């Protein structure tokens, strides 16, 4: 099968045809229509790469973001859920783009990164306003999970942590808000 690469801004998206779940065109269309292009800055590629050695080291990992290269690699299709694996793959791509956006904040907007770190610490110290168990792992996963939830299920983030929702809306997405997730659609 020919490896198809689609460019979104300066980010190459490719290899997803091999997943059997989504095409590179579908992923690129989603990213183009949904994610602010500034969130792709410094991210050279988003690749479906199930044979990447990182996935041997992390047998349950769905994807990873490399903070040095800003590359995003998505893992084997069989690791995605049985009920809606296509949506889980899109959720995962969104989560990994969230890591890229967070890394760019750390590198260029320390005051916003510090606000996020403070929200994470407050959550960790008793407020328990995480959108998922995985979000409680560390401030990086909290940001990426909250980013994904802001885009994919904004009502959940607004319910769980109005402060994190407001920070995402005001500082990360420049006021852009997403429609609520429709029950039964995803």
Language model features by range: what are they?
Residues 20-35:
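Export/targeting segments at the very N-terminus of extracytoplasmic proteins
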Residues 7-22, 39-186:
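Active-site-flanking segments in enzyme catalytic domains
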């Amino acid at each position: 099968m020919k490896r198809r690469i689609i460019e979104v801004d300066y980010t190459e998206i490719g290899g997803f045809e091999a997943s059997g779940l989504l095409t590179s065109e579908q992923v690129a269309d989603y990213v183009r229509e949904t994610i602010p292009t500034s969130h792709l800055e410094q991210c050279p590629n988003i690749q479906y790469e199930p044979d990447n050695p990182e996935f041997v080291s992390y047998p349950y990992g769905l994807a990873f973001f490399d903070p040095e290269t800003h590359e995003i690699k998505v893992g084997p299709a069989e690791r995605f859920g049985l009920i809606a694996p296509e949506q889980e793959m899109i959720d995962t791509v969104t989560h990994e783009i969230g890591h890229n956006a967070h890394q760019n904040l750390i590198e260029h907007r320390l005051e916003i990164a510090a606000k996020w770190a403070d929200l994470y610490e407050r959550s960790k110290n008793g407020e328990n306003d995480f959108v998922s168990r995985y979000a409680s792992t560390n401030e990086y996963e909290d940001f990426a999970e909250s980013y994904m939830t802001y885009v994919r299920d904004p009502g959940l983030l607004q319910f769980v942590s109005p402060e994190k929702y407001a920070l995402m809306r005001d500082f990360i997405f420049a006021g852009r808000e997403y429609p609520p997730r429709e029950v039964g659609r995803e």
